[in-house]
Amino acid sequence: TAITVAEVGATQMACSSIQVVEPLKIIPFYIDVAKGYEWSTDLGVMETLGGECQRWFEKEPVGVLAAITPWNVPTQVNLAKIIPALAAGCCVVLKPAPDTSWTGLALGKLIAENTDFPPGVVNVVSAADPAAGSYLTDDHRVDMISFTGSTVTGRKVMEAASANITKVFLELGGKSALIVLDDVEDFGMVAATAAFGMATVCGQGCALSTRILLPRSRYGEAVDAIAAMMAAVPPGDPTDAATMMGPLISARQRDRVEGYVQSAIDEGARIVCGGSRPDGMDRGFFYEPTLIADVDNSMTVAQEEIFGPVLVAIPFEDDDEAVMIANDSIYGLSGAVFSGDEQRALQVAKQIRTGTMSVNGGVWYGADVPFGGFKQSGIGREMGTAGFEEHLETKSYSKPV
């Protein structure tokens, strides 16, 4: 936890959930999956080409996994890649992000000192240069590449892997929509979901719902409720247990956020709250929780992943337009819908082209839940049994009877 707070800027609250404590549940889950998995499947006897044959197929490890991980939730992603790979029988080379090398190296040290894995089964390679990952993506001895990061870098990983036809898992960017239907009685839950979800990782999460779609008939009411809730989660010292939102990871990331906020202003949007660095917080890369209203879905801030504590509020007329706006994105990683009618909410949720959906505040995160994206948000699934099977090959057998 101390390393995560110091390196990521994560709050104590985040470390007690998504940053450290919850990811630890990945370990026992995959132990149980491996123990109970059907490694061999009997297909029975069949007459084929004039002879009877006994057929079956078996699952075996894909081989050497190159795991390239991001800086936003490093322990979560490192474990989500290493543990299922080991459970499947693979060797792993972990390359953590330069901004969070300590977290990756600490995990490697824990594994080396507390398990009986032979040398070379788990390897951690740290480097200040992000391009160091290309040594792994280009190497023909790597059997699978598992990458979590931006869509821009994901394209480069996929291109590099094509030279050796290396299997690729990609979990990439997102611009997920939180849809609020017009029959919601109270915007309190909506506002809390939007604000506190954003605050947990200071908006630096690919699966966060950063586009808030609101019924035009209640737009002002909803915007006010969300702005009030966001004002209740100001940034603070992550070492203070009472702090709900820490700093951004780096000056580079804060500059990126500021650039997007300025682009929204330039395109005619309105800053409802936040929009600047907080006064008196010069140590650390802090930025105020920011809500931008009067946003059209074609604006840059509605189409591109900002990766900071910025939400955009987009109005819609009816359910059909809400679905259209939500799907009008190159991404498809996550999303949410709120309605006073659960069936109506589910009907909308099923029309959104995305890998995960929260209905009326439901939490989908868990070691047993497959996670991944549609469209340019990725290829394949992490977590769950599906995440285990990503690390397996299928070999079919036949013998005469």
Task: List each language-model region with its residue ranges.
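Structural signal for hydrophobic packing residues in well-ordered secondary-structure cores
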Residues: 1, 8, 12, 30-38, ...
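N-terminal Rossmann-like NAD(P)+-binding subdomain of aldehyde/semialdehyde dehydrogenases
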Residues: 1-53
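Residue-level signal for inorganic ion chemistry
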Residues: 4, 89, 122, 145, ...
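Hydrophobic packing residues within well-ordered alpha-helices of enzyme cores
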Residues: 27, 104-107, 136, 157, ...
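Rossmann-like NAD(P) dinucleotide-binding subdomain of oxidoreductase/dehydrogenase enzymes
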Residues: 42-189, 316
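A short hydrophobic/small-residue beta-strand
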Residues: 91-93, 271, 356
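Conserved C-terminal structural/oligomerization subdomain of aldehyde/semialdehyde dehydrogenase
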Residues: 116, 141-142, 179, 234, ...
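ALDH superfamily catalytic-core signature
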Residues: 152-296, 359
